[in-house]
């Protein structure tokens, strides 16, 4: 009898989980938002600067499990519902700048590198966070800013 109750509770929980998953169409259009940044610094210091945003005609990325991080990289792009910390989309990456930071040149020279990230095109304003981390996953630089899709051509 105890097993039947446990089985029933497990089935109810499994049926409820898919209902909580976000739908792509609720927050995003079937388009791509390309975000361009400049990442600059040397072997010790780094900074992130927003350059511009572009709209591309279709979204070719995943449309399910948008708020799940599948791999750890040296960086992360996260799209939040504007004004809240609700994650709408997350993806990880590693930049050429972070590889360059490990070179001898980076010990005595500052450089900047362009980086572009593709995210689903939001229907409403969103907050975007770009985070860079070291090899121990300690955050070394972060930029968070608002993107209004009506301002993008």
Features from the language model and the residues they span:
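Residue-level signal for secondary-structure boundary sites
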Residues: 17, 85, 136-138
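Serine/threonine-rich low-complexity intrinsically disordered regions
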Residues: 3-5, 103, 148
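Bacterial Sec-dependent N-terminal signal peptides
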Residues: 1-25
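N-terminal prosegments of processed precursors
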Residues: 22-115
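Extended acidic/polar, glycine-enriched regions
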Residues: 109-153
